[in-house]
Amino acid sequence: MEIAARDVKSLRDKTGAGMMECKRALQECAGDALCAEKYLKERGLAAIENRRGRATAEGVIVIKARHAEGAACGASAVAMVELVCETDFVAKNAEFIALAERIAQAVLEHAYTEVNQVLRDMVVDLATRVRENMSLTRLALLRAGSAGAGQYLSHYVHPDKKTGVVLSFSSDAPDVFLRSDVRAFAYDCCLHAAAYTPRYVRAEDVPAEYVREQREVFQAHVASLQKPAHVKESIVQGKLEKHLAEICFLKQPFVKDDKLSVEKKMAEVGARAGGALRFTQALIYQLGVQ
């Protein structure tokens, strides 16, 4: 059957499939465009299944925010998603990035809290056209209270789109979040988190089992020292506290003022603003790192 070039082009524009594939699909479907579109989709889904086991080490992290009325109120909700693929070439493709942004917007608008079929279908649509294994690996949605509730969301995505941060702050004095210096500090905390990628917010958040294991490691380090037991224990405790300071957000030296920890800098900013600041939630995504 002879297939008109305009029909092939029309099908290609709709599906993104190659010209020869579109022509073959139209021939298989006796020129029926809807049938050909379905044919291509089914073939694409089959190809996706064949590629499912391929490694997806590339991708992007994207954030979308909804802002409350009035610029001073900050974001009322923030969505962050991680979309992965096989190659750096696709990860940098405008269409792939646009897909991640649409997914983040959908999470924001529909308050999705987990990956669902609607979102998977959005990924499949592009994956069938670019012939690469893709996956929406995780998403998160954080909400702030009303403008006067004493809550504030700040966020940051690194330019390479491989690290994203959303931080939630609270205060008993809601007006502190109207101050530019407090908001700047909140944003700087996001920059800090992206640079240092702390594993925990507070020392109390570190699992007891992990602390025990690290203590045993440090005890092994000092076992051969010719020192009294209480001195060895003091050395172990010092090493443990230093290690916890390295992996806990509040204990790390603040990125913009390394003479103070994040915790002490936050206390300083809060005191100057007239209201104590607190972290209520910290969400850090690194591409491929769960």
UniProtKB/Swiss-Prot annotation:
Gene3D superfamilies named in the record: 1.10.286.20, DNA helicase RuvA subunit, C-terminal domain, Elongation factor Ts, dimerisation domain
UniProt key word Oxidoreductase: no
GO CC list: cytoplasm
Pfam families registered for this protein in UniProt: EF_TS (PF00889)
PROSITE patterns noted in UniProt: EF_TS_1 (PS01126), EF_TS_2 (PS01127)
GO molecular function, one term: translation elongation factor activity
Subcellular location: Cytoplasm
Region (Involved in Mg(2+) ion dislocation from EF-Tu): 87-90
UniProtKB keywords: Cytoplasm, Elongation factor, Protein biosynthesis
Main location group: cytoplasm
Keyword Protein biosynthesis: yes
Family matches, as NCBIfam families: tsf
Record's function text: Associates with the EF-Tu.GDP complex and induces the exchange of GDP to GTP. It remains bound to the aminoacyl-tRNA.EF-Tu.GTP complex up to the GTP hydrolysis stage on the ribosome.
Similarity field: Belongs to the EF-Ts family.
Name of the molecule in the record: Elongation factor Ts
